[in-house]
């Protein structure tokens, strides 16, 4: 079991609870001690004859076939499948996230048993729950009819995701991330959650641009790239060229050099008609969070990602810090449009699922069979158990509901003019809002998002 990613997920939720309750939870076990304790307990369990096996040998399978539609028209939809209602209620995590084909069809092979499918197409559609049974070597056919419950498109709004990765970020194309999805799969994933536009922002290259621009069936593809700088990530939106931040090394790595490279690439993006954005400015890694010495020049960017889909939008997280900073920038008169991006590296959202099930299994063994580990571990195990019981239900709730692509939407007002440059211009001007579900548009005396309103006192004086 690879523990690093699991620990990072635990720490995200721990940080949130610490911020909410103003207490420290990891004072007795730091990151390394957590990993060492889990590895030790896993070996103790194995020595006692307990081995983790996600899928029992000889499992029998059947097939589920689904057809989704809006009225009588096929629709691309997201499908979440739980193995049964009891697991969902107990938060014992067992979830598959799938995406239908363009014609609304889905066929998937599943172990025999009882299931429930949750089918939706984003916040403007109803959610349909369909229970079904899988029988050995049989095909179970189900249907889901989705109803449109909101019509923001009719009022000039369009929804999209500005931060997503594909196979072009992987080692196959010179990248470092284990992403396997093609641009076509990414587009269907975005559409399954109600997106009408999207930016495919791979690392290190612009190789996806030609293929991404072909994804134009009821969808507006925006070309982009996420630029690595070694002290932050910059999103170039709407530029076809490969803008590169020249990372200085050795004695040449000075604050002035780093600062000037930020200025240069943002200027280049703007000159080429693009929009420069700072991504996840408070990320946990030094190489991916924005250099804290450079906030004085943040206006070289035109937008700022305050909601990153890899972490909850909750107190204490990188998103909460970015949101707070964005508000303080507004107070200083520095106006950047707030955006969100899923930062998806896996459209199926199953990065943690084997890990979460493994941790459930291990903690179940440890709590039921304390005899498997030496008494010298009692204090650490007791603390780990307390941490697990306090943090795990909250964390699983986030993974189940929110750890999927495009959870938070960018809604941009274009008045029906949905070409890439028109969408980017609307973002520049702040004609947008972000939401993870509630759809609220607001006007003050006929003025909506992004328009400067002059407040007057009772005498009519500004």
Q: What role is predicted for each listed range?
A:
Residues 127, 150-279, 285-287, 292, ...:
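A metal-dependent hydrolase metal-coordination microenvironment
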Residues 10, 41-63, 67-85, 89-105, ...:
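C-terminal functional module detector
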Residues 108-110:
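Short, flexible loop/turn segments at beta-strand junctions in immunoglobulin-like
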Residues 6-13:
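Short amphipathic alpha-helical heptad-repeat segments
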């Amino acid at each position: 079991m690879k523990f690093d990613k699991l620990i990072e997920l635990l720490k995200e939720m721990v940080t949130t609870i610490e911020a909410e309750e103003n207490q420290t939870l990891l004072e007795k076990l730091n990151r390394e001690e957590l990993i060492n304790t889990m590895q030790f307990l896993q070996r103790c369990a194995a020595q006692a004859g307990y081995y983790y096996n996600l899928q029992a040998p000889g499992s029998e399978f059947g097939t589920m076939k689904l057809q989704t539609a809006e009225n009588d028209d096929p629709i691309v939809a997201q499908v979440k499948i739980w193995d049964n209602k009891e697991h969902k209620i107990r938060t014992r995590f067992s979830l598959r996230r799938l995406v239908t084909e363009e014609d609304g069809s889905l066929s998937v092979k599943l172990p025999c048993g009882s299931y429930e499918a949750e089918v939706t197409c984003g916040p403007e559609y109803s959610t349909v729950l369909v229970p079904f049974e899988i029988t050995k070597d049989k095909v179970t056919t189900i249907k889901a009819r989705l109803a449109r419950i909101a019509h923001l498109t009719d009022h000039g709004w369009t929804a999209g995701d500005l931060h997503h990765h594909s196979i072009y970020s992987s080692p196959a194309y010179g990248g470092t991330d284990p992403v396997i999805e093609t641009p076509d799969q990414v587009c269907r994933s975005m559409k399954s959650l109600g997106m009408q536009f999207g930016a495919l922002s791979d690392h290190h290259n612009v190789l996806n641009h030609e293929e991404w621009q072909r994804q134009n069936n009821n969808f507006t593809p925006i070309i982009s790239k996420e630029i690595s700088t070694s002290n932050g990530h910059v999103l170039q939106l709407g530029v076809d060229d490969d803008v590169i931040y020249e990372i200085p090394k050795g004695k040449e790595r000075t604050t002035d050099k780093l600062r000037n490279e930020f200025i240069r690439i943002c200027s280049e993006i703007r000159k080429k008609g693009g929009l420069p954005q700072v991504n996840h400015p408070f990320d946990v890694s030094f190489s991916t969070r924005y250099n804290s010495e450079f906030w004085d020049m943040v206006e070289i960017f035109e937008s700022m990602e305050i909601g990153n889909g890899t972490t909850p939008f909750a107190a204490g997280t990188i998103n909460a810090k970015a949101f707070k900073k964005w508000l303080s920038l507004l107070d200083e008169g520095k106006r950047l449009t707030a955006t969100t991006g899923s930062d998806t590296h896996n459209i199926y959202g199953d990065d943690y699922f084997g890990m979460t099930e493994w941790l459930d299994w291990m903690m179940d063994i440890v709590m039921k069979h304390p005899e498997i580990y030496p008494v010298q571990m009692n204090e650490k195990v007791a603390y780990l158990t307390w941490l697990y019981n306090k943090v795990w239900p909250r964390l699983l709730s986030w993974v189940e509901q929110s750890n999927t692509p495009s959870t938070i939407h960018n809604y941009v007002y274009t008045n029906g003019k949905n070409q890439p440059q028109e969408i980017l211009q609307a973002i520049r001007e702040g004609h947008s809002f972000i939401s993870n579900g509630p759809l609220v548009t607001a006007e003050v005396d006929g003025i909506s998002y992004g328009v400067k309103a002059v407040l007057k006192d009772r005498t009519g004086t500004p």
